[in-house]
């Protein structure tokens, strides 16, 4: 199954951007996933291609117009009725690995990228958008946030990351949340040594060290991700 992504934006030239590089870009070139970028402005009907207007009730900034965005969405739905509609928003549910895993199983998703002060709320309510946030901070638009979401989904698709163990052992995928510390050659650098267990050749001890490291790092930095009932085993 090919993972199809539709992007609704007023800045289509921003794509594929970072999605055109590394394993994500290679997967795009191989057809493992497809990217369809749609310019919202092309659905504006006035000569100036206006996509925004002043907010009712007053307030700073401009709001993206429901009629223009609605026409763009209708165009997508005319050929992809089952697409999952997503809006990148600081008010949305916070993105995590579980959400990415769920979305990666869809054959078609459509991401709406807002700009200015946001979009007319009626659009989100009428089409029942799933709102997603990538963190508690504000960006100038949804394009960069959509790239984050897409990458987290695409790399979970079989065939994108060649080493399956890489995904299994990563932060938020491994049993205890955050990934253990990683090292490579040289074994000694500026007086700092690689942990001796990692060069011991004893795979049982190495695996235990990785589990302990993962748990300790998670407990220190993201304690809400740890299972306190099992904690003593890994101290």
UniProtKB/Swiss-Prot annotation:
Subunit details for this protein? Homodimer.
Assigned GO CC terms: cytosol
Coarse class of the primary localization is cytoplasm
Q: Which Pfam families match?
A: tRNA_m1G_MT
Any idea where this protein resides? Cytoplasm
Sorted UniProt keywords? Cytoplasm, Methyltransferase, S-adenosyl-L-methionine, Transferase, tRNA processing
- PANTHER family named in the record: TRNA (GUANINE-N(1)-)-METHYLTRANSFERASE (PTHR46417:SF1)
Q: Which InterPro entries match?
A: Alpha/beta_knot_MTases (IPR029028), tRNA_m1G_MeTrfase_C_sf (IPR023148), tRNA_m1G_MeTrfase_TrmD (IPR002649), tRNA_m1G_MTases_N (IPR029026), tRNA_MeTrfase_TRMD/TRM10 (IPR016009)
Similarity comment text for this entry: Belongs to the RNA methyltransferase TrmD family.
Task: Give the reactions, separated by semicolons, that this protein catalyses.
Answer: guanosine(37) in tRNA + S-adenosyl-L-methionine = N(1)-methylguanosine(37) in tRNA + S-adenosyl-L-homocysteine + H(+)
Per the UniProt entry, the Enzyme Commission number(s) are 2.1.1.228
Q: What is this protein called?
A: tRNA (guanine-N(1)-)-methyltransferase
Q: Which GO terms describe its molecular function?
A: tRNA (guanine(37)-N1)-methyltransferase activity
Q: Name one GO biological process term.
A: tRNA N1-guanine methylation
Task: Describe its function.
Answer: Specifically methylates guanosine-37 in various tRNAs.
Q: Which organism is it from?
A: Ehrlichia ruminantium (strain Gardel)
Q: List cystine links.
A: none
Query: What residues bind S-adenosyl-L-methionine, as annotated?
Result: 114, 134-139
Checking HAMAP family in the record gives: TrmD (MF_00605)
Q: Which gene encodes it?
A: trmD
């Amino acid at each position: 199954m090919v993972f199809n992504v539709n992007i609704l934006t007023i800045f289509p030239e921003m794509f594929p951007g970072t999605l055109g590089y590394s394993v994500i870009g290679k997967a795009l070139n191989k057809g493992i996933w497809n990217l369809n970028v749609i310019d919202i402005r092309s659905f504006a009907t006035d000569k100036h291609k206006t996509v925004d207007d002043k907010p009712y009730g007053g307030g700073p900034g401009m709001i993206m117009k429901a009629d223009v965005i609605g026409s763009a969405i209708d165009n997508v739905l005319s050929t992809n009725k089952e697409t999952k509609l997503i809006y990148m928003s600081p008010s949305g549910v916070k993105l995590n690995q579980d959400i990415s895993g769920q979305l990666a199983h869809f054959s078609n998703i459509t991401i709406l990228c807002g700009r200015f002060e946001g979009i007319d709320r009626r659009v989100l309510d009428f089409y029942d958008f799933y709102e997603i946030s990538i963190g508690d901070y504000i960006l100038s638009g949804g394009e960069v946030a959509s790239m984050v979401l897409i990458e987290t989904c695409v790399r979970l698709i079989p065939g994108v990351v060649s080493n399956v163990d890489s995904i299994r052992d990563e932060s938020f995928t491994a049993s205890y949340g955050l990934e253990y510390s990683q090292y490579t050659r040289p074994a000694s650098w500026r007086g700092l040594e690689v942990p001796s267990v990692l060069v011991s050749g004893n795979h049982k001890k190495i695996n235990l060290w990785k589990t302990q490291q993962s748990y300790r790092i998670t407990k220190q930095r993201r304690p809400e991700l740890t299972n306190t009932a099992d904690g003593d085993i890994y101290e």
